[in-house]
Amino acid sequence: MAAVKDSCGKGEMATGNGRRLHLGIPEAVFVEDVDSFMKQPGNETADTVLKKLDEQYQKYKFMELNLAQKKRRLKGQIPEIKQTLEILKYMQKKKESTNSMETRFLLADNLYCKASVPPTDKVCLWLGANVMLEYDIDEAQALLEKNLSTATKNLDSLEEDLDFLRDQFTTTEVNMARVYNWDVKRRNKDDSTKNKA
């Protein structure tokens, strides 16, 4: 089955049947028939299969940790972008007046300094990695609105991916329990057969 890039968003793919793949997260396949599953090549013993399933489970846990970190980072960025947009809107109103704008800016943790800012049509934005660029207020506002939209879409996508990942946890845990129970039944059957003999 071929996968093609979809317009759903960054990192998302759609398969031929319209199902969505999530950021390269492999889908855990539910084991319906444990007997036939255990007869497949590579599934010689229950311990081997349980080890593989546990490795898969640990990979899902690692992916969850990474996605949760991205989610926290985005949840921190979105309010900052909104606050900066509010400041730009305020500056947009004030740029026509001749009065200076009084403000406080952060020097260090819990240390602010007062400043008087004359009306201006230019602002400087931190872009990250110690890079700051000067923009017209309108350009800065457009850039920040685009960044806010992208961050919101990415957050929604991360939420969906985390939900998908939780489903994979559940499926993997159920598979592990089914294989373990199958092995217990098999050993009990073997023990009862030996006791009869």
Swiss-Prot record:
Localization, UniProt: Cytoplasm; Nucleus
Residues annotated with N-acetylalanine modification: 2
MF terms (GO), sorted A to Z: amyloid-beta binding; tubulin binding; unfolded protein binding
GO-annotated biological processes: chaperone-mediated protein folding; microtubule-based process; negative regulation of amyloid fibril formation; protein folding; tubulin complex assembly
Any GO CC annotation of this UniProt entry: nucleus
Tissue: Ubiquitous.
Positions of post-translational N6-acetyllysine modification: 59
Keyword line: Acetylation, Chaperone, Cytoplasm, Nucleus
Alphabetical list of InterPro entries matching this protein: PFD3, Prefoldin, Prefoldin_subunit_alpha
Presence of keyword Zinc-finger: no
A Pfam family this chain is assigned to: Prefoldin
Subunit structure, as described in the record: Heterohexamer of two PFD-alpha type and four PFD-beta type subunits. Binds to the C-terminal part of VHL.
Family matches, as PANTHER family: PREFOLDIN SUBUNIT 3 (PTHR12409:SF0)
Biological role stated in the UniProt entry: Binds specifically to cytosolic chaperonin (c-CPN) and transfers target proteins to it. Binds to nascent polypeptide chain and promotes folding in an environment in which there are many competing pathways for nonnative proteins.
Family: Belongs to the prefoldin subunit alpha family.
Descriptive protein name: Prefoldin subunit 3
Gene that this sequence comes from: VBP1
